């Protein structure tokens, strides 16, 4: 195959990264240690913000023949936007596990969960000749690893052997016992696949069992303790390039984040989300507001044990009740809408150049979100499950997916993002979210009431489903898998069908600025955001005309018209027809 010049590839790749940066730098991850959770489970989350592959596909594991290869595709996470191209291949292993594929593969049958966020990092370590992007490593790690620690080591070893050709990434790799925060960047511009040198710089840090981690599109790993191999892992030769480049000197703390991430002074998109999630879980800390030039602690102890509801609340958040509340102010429009569409840089006032609207955790351009937990008192296929939500986290309805299921309904595995499709579950949630933009104040509450009908039921029956699955598991893991697959598929189909019904009910209820009640009566909802009404200029043109015409602003004060000086003569009658 003809090879394009190295620097041509580098330039193209960097341009692609920069073009995608506005959407790629947009994910939020929360991880909860087992002693920090209310029920003793580990928890991990991921909101995949931007245009990414939302389709959930179960990829079966199995045994493989010697010499079998695995195709590696570039940027598979954007498969609904562009068709990925094959970049290379690596040898397959003898046995693989079933895993769940989506933009960023997130679970396997062994109970390992992965949440992801992008942070890109400095250009000096980027190298497009590396074999893997982060989604490739997640796929291979979940196929081949049965614990979080093992998955981290597998991904790191593969990246070192074949090269990492992506920007800086963070993965929260979780099983029922521990959580590892894994971060990775490229090997440097001069690395070559045939060099025999490590093809990546990576490190991982174990989250303390009684603490909570939050990451939001910047490196959060901090200082690597090379004397603590129980709680840290790292790549071979990780200090070599930083020392050669003058980024680090022997005897200094090896701060992975400062060395490999870019300077984010004056940026708030990441730190604001970190602050908000930490503040919701530990308000007693009264964490200060910081920009991207500073870091919060790697992890914190929550004020109370964390529940699933706490995590759902975090992913509903639009900074309500804070100085940064996106539901108030002129930009929230007449109906208190927290969502902000992109604005061109030349439309931003000179005084605000370099800044933008506040970055909240829940955004309307999200592709999907999941909140997962691994419960060690049950077999992994039962104890590990995630709650998957399509589209905006604050308007979705989460559905349960157990690690042991063997398939999911087709409606959740399809959906071309370039063409509206009522056969796709994702489009149901995207449609409802878009319709809600018309009357956010009214429909947002109704959406939450509707999703509670489903989610409350799923939560209420969870203990019974777990118990029945565990009973069947003792007889046969296959029976348990069949039971969980049937349950999960029924739940997902119920929500898919119900959400389309709900969508059309909203269309028939909210239109033309009115709310149509079931009895046929119509209600004018008005404008509920006083900030917008006050700034809207309502009545200004008519007030100005009243002043111009009458010298006053009200009809009551307008002077009466004066009577004419003389009475007009009576009109002459027309002559009668003869």
What are these regions (language model features)?
Residues 14, 18-20, 559-578:
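Ser/Thr-rich, Proline-interspersed low-complexity disordered segments
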């Amino acid at each position: 195959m003809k090879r394009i010049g190295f620097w041509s590839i580098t330039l193209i790749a960097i341009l692609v990264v920069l073009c995608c940066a506005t959407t790629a730098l947009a994910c939020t991850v929360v991880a909860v240690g087992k002693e920090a959770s209310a029920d003793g489970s580990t928890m991990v989350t991921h909101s995949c913000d931007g245009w990414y592959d939302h389709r959930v596909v179960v990829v079966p594991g199995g045994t493989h023949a010697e010499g079998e290869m695995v195709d590696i595709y570039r940027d598979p996470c954007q498969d609904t936007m562009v068709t990925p191209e094959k970049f290379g291949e690596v040898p397959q292993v003898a046995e693989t596990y079933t895993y769940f594929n989506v933009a960023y593969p997130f679970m396997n049958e062994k109970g390992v969960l992965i949440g992801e966020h992008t942070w890109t990092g400095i250009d000096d370590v980027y190298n497009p000749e590396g074999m893997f992007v982060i989604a490739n490593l997640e796929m291979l790690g979940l196929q081949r690893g049965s614990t979080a620690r093992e998955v981290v080591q597998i991904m790191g070893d593969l990246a070192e052997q074949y090269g990492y050709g992506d920007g800086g990434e963070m993965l929260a790799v979780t099983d029922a016992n521990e959580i590892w925060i894994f971060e990775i960047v490229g090997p440097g511009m001069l690395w070559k696949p045939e060099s025999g040198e490590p093809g990546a710089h990576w490190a991982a840090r174990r989250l303390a069992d009684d603490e909570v981690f939050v990451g939001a599109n910047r490196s959060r790993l901090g200082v690597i303790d090379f004397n603590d191999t129980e709680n840290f892992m790292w790549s071979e030769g990780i200090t070599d390039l930083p020392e050669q480049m003058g980024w680090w000197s022997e005897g200094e703390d090896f701060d992975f984040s400062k060395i490999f991430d870019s300077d984010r002074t004056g940026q708030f998109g990441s730190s604001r989300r970190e602050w908000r999630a930490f503040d919701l879980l530990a308000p007693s800390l009264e964490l200060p507001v910081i920009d991207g030039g500073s870091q919060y602690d790697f992890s914190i102890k929550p004020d109370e044990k964390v529940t699933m509801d706490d995590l759902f609340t975090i992913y509903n958040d639009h900074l309500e009740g804070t100085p940064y509340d996106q539901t108030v102010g002129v930009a929230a429009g007449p109906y208190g809408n927290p969502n902000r569409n992109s604005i061109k840089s030349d439309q931003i006032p000179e005084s605000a150049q370099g800044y933008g609207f506040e970055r909240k955790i829940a955004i309307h351009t999200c592709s999907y979100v999941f909140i997962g937990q691994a419960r060690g008192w049950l077999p992994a296929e039962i104890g590990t499950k995630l709650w998957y939500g399509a589209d905006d986290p604050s308007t979705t309805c989460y559905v349960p997916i157990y690690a042991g299921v063997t398939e999911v309904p087709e409606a959740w595995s399809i959906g071309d993002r370039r063409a509206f499709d009522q056969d796709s579950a994702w489009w149901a949630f995207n449609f409802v979210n878009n319709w809600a933009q018309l009357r956010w104040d009214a429909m947002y509450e109704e959406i939450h009431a509707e999703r509670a009908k489903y989610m409350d039921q799923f939560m209420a029956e969870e203990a019974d489903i777990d118990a029945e699955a565990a009973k069947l598991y003792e007889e046969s893991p296959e029976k348990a898998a069949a039971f969980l697959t049937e349950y999960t598929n029924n739940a997902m189909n119920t929500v898919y069908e119900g959400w389309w019904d709900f969508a059309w009910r909203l269309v028939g209820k909210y239109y033309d600025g009115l709310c149509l009640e079931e009895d046929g009566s119509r209600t004018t909802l008005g404008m509920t955001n006083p900030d917008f009404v006050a700034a809207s200029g309502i009545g200004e043109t008519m007030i100005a005309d009243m002043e111009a015409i009458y010298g006053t602003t009200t009809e009551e004060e307008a002077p009466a018209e004066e009577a004419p000086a003389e009475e007009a003569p009576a009109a002459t009658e027309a002559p009668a027809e003869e």
